[in-house]
Amino acid sequence: MARIAGINIPDQKHAVIALTAIYGIGKTRSKAILADVGIAEDVKISELTEEQIDQLRDGVAKYTVEGDLRREVSMNIKRLMDLGCYRGLRHRRSLPLRGQRTKTNARTRKGPRKPIKK
């Protein structure tokens, strides 16, 4: 298994799909990285040479991925909450942010129902 950005990349998958195992890299960014490096999308990771894997590592290193990206996202949410803006308040109360209704159909964001004690 190749190790890129601290993640074990699956060997038996095509390169374009295998790179999506890294947090912050989807299919589009994966295709862009492979095009920059000059590796075909349909090549399996197990067929790549060490030199090509090193090139992939360098290509992925240009982007914010994994722990750095998770930290950046959580810091952005924390900043909104500290500002006290509307989005920050909605985050703090675990409610939908983007104008969805909450009388019904907000169970995913609100979590399971809490019974009322008598």
Swiss-Prot record:
<protein>
    <recommendedName>
        <fullName>Small ribosomal subunit protein uS13</fullName>
    </recommendedName>
</protein>
<keyword id="KW-0689">Ribosomal protein</keyword>
<dbReference type="GO" id="GO:0003735">
    <property type="term" value="F:structural constituent of ribosome"/>
</dbReference>
<dbReference type="InterPro" id="IPR010979">
    <property type="entry name" value="Ribosomal_uS13-like_H2TH"/>
</dbReference>
<dbReference type="GO" id="GO:0005829">
    <property type="term" value="C:cytosol"/>
</dbReference>
<feature type="region of interest" description="Disordered">
    <location>
        <begin position="94"/>
        <end position="118"/>
    </location>
</feature>
<comment type="function">
    <text>Located at the top of the head of the 30S subunit, it contacts several helices of the 16S rRNA. In the 70S ribosome it contacts the 23S rRNA (bridge B1a) and protein L5 of the 50S subunit (bridge B1b), connecting the 2 subunits; these bridges are implicated in subunit movement. Contacts the tRNAs in the A and P-sites.</text>
</comment>
<dbReference type="GO" id="GO:0015935">
    <property type="term" value="C:small ribosomal subunit"/>
</dbReference>
<dbReference type="GO" id="GO:0000049">
    <property type="term" value="F:tRNA binding"/>
</dbReference>
<keyword id="KW-0699">rRNA-binding</keyword>
<keyword id="KW-0694">RNA-binding</keyword>
<dbReference type="InterPro" id="IPR019980">
    <property type="entry name" value="Ribosomal_uS13_bac-type"/>
</dbReference>
<dbReference type="GO" id="GO:0006412">
    <property type="term" value="P:translation"/>
</dbReference>
<keyword id="KW-0687">Ribonucleoprotein</keyword>
<comment type="subunit">
    <text>Part of the 30S ribosomal subunit. Forms a loose heterodimer with protein S19. Forms two bridges to the 50S subunit in the 70S ribosome.</text>
</comment>
<dbReference type="InterPro" id="IPR018269">
    <property type="entry name" value="Ribosomal_uS13_CS"/>
</dbReference>
<dbReference type="InterPro" id="IPR027437">
    <property type="entry name" value="Rbsml_uS13_C"/>
</dbReference>
<dbReference type="InterPro" id="IPR001892">
    <property type="entry name" value="Ribosomal_uS13"/>
</dbReference>
<keyword id="KW-0820">tRNA-binding</keyword>
<dbReference type="GO" id="GO:0019843">
    <property type="term" value="F:rRNA binding"/>
</dbReference>
<comment type="similarity">
    <text>Belongs to the universal ribosomal protein uS13 family.</text>
</comment>
<dbReference type="Pfam" id="PF00416">
    <property type="entry name" value="Ribosomal_S13"/>
</dbReference>
